[in-house]
Structures are given as C-alpha cells and as structure tokens.
C-alpha cells in the first residue's frame, strides 16, 4: 500500500510540474534532461492539437501569445476528459471562465473561440437527421421544411465567420451576426 501511495504521489508531482514548470519543482529522482523532454512533448502536443481545433485563433496570435494561452490553460484549468475531441470544449471553458484577458487581447476572442468550437462540434457530430415521413422527391414550395439535426442558432457581436489575419475588427457590428 505504501508503494502505491508513493507512486501516486510521484505521479501527482510529475503532472503538477508538467502543467506549471515555472512554479512547481520537478519530482525527486527524475533526471532534469528527461523531465525537459516530457515538458516539451506535453506542451508542444497540446499546443499543436489546440491550434488544429482553433486555427483562426492561432493564426491571429503571435507565438508568444499562443504559448501564453496554452500555458495558462495547463496551469489553471482542471480538464475533466482524456479524449482529444473534448479538449476544445475544455479550452473554451477555460477561456470563458478562467482566462484573465489582457488589455491588448482582441475584443472578439471569446466569440471567435466559441465559433471555432461550434464548427468543430458540428464537423465531428454523429447526429443523424430524422427523415421518416420526408418525401425526397416532394415539392419544395408546397412541402414542410425539415430542420437539420445539425442546425444551430448563434448570434455574435463580431463577424467571427470573417475574422482572419487580414480582418481583425476593432468594433462590433451594428447588428448581431
């Protein structure tokens, strides 16, 4: 039992250091070179994974800004899932509830992150449309419209669907988008 507890404590110390190497010392007994490899692998893999899920958010930020987002996520957010496809939801939750925005952060940051998360969620959804009772050859003008199971209604203050490195609005739209 003591060995099991000791191993678990070492795992917690290892994970705590990986998440916040600037403030948490590495566990005893692990060579610093090896620890640096683990730190780099974890950080770079998470950064790359989240950049894939939030491509526009990544493109409009410098490397230093992006590293700050990832490091803050690692330090402050207790992710509840081991699944890669659920990490974007965790990252969005971090941005919405724990992220401390700086004065120079884009005013549309949260809306853009939500939009990109919604795109991903719809892209990987396995929801199927209920087509029972729908005539695929029916008259579109006299028939009753059928809503896709993937239809979502969102309203954003910024034109998040247009944001890119070449379009970075400073003011919200006159009407919700």
Regions inferred by a protein language model and the residue ranges of each:
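Generic detector of short, locally flexible boundary/turn motifs and exposed helical patches
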Residues: 21-24, 31-34, 57, 85, ...
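Glycine/small-residue-rich interface belts in oligomeric ring/scaffold proteins
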Residues: 29-72
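Charged, compositionally biased N-terminal leader segments and the immediate start
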Residues: 1-36
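Alpha-helix initiation and N-capping motif
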Residues: 7, 11, 54, 63-67, ...
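Hydrophobic packing positions characteristic
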Residues: 75-177
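Short helix-capping/linker segments at secondary-structure and domain boundaries
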Residues: 21-25, 61-64, 99-101
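Short alpha-helical scaffolding segments that buttress acidic/His motifs in well-ordered protein cores
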Residues: 14, 69-74, 91
């Amino acid at each position: 039992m003591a060995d099991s507890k000791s191993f678990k404590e070492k795992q917690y110390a290892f994970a705590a250091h990986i998440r916040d190497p600037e403030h948490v010392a590495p566990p005893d007994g692990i060579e610093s070179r090896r620890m640096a490899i683990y730190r780099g692998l974890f950080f770079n893999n998470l950064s790359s994974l989240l950049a894939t899920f939030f491509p526009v958010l990544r493109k409009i930020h410098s490397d230093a800004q992006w590293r700050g987002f990832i490091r803050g996520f690692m330090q402050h957010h207790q992710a509840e899932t081991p699944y890669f496809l659920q990490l974007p939801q965790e990252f969005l939750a971090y941005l919405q509830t724990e992220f401390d925005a700086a004065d120079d952060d884009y005013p549309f940051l949260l809306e853009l992150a939500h939009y990109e998360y919604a795109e991903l969620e719809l892209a990987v959804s396995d929801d199927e449309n209920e087509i029972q009772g729908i005539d695929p050859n029916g008259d579109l003008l006299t028939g009753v419209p059928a809503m896709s199971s993937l239809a979502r209604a969102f309203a954003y203050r910024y034109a998040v669907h247009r944001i890119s490195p070449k379009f970075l609005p400073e003011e919200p739209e006159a009407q919700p988008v």
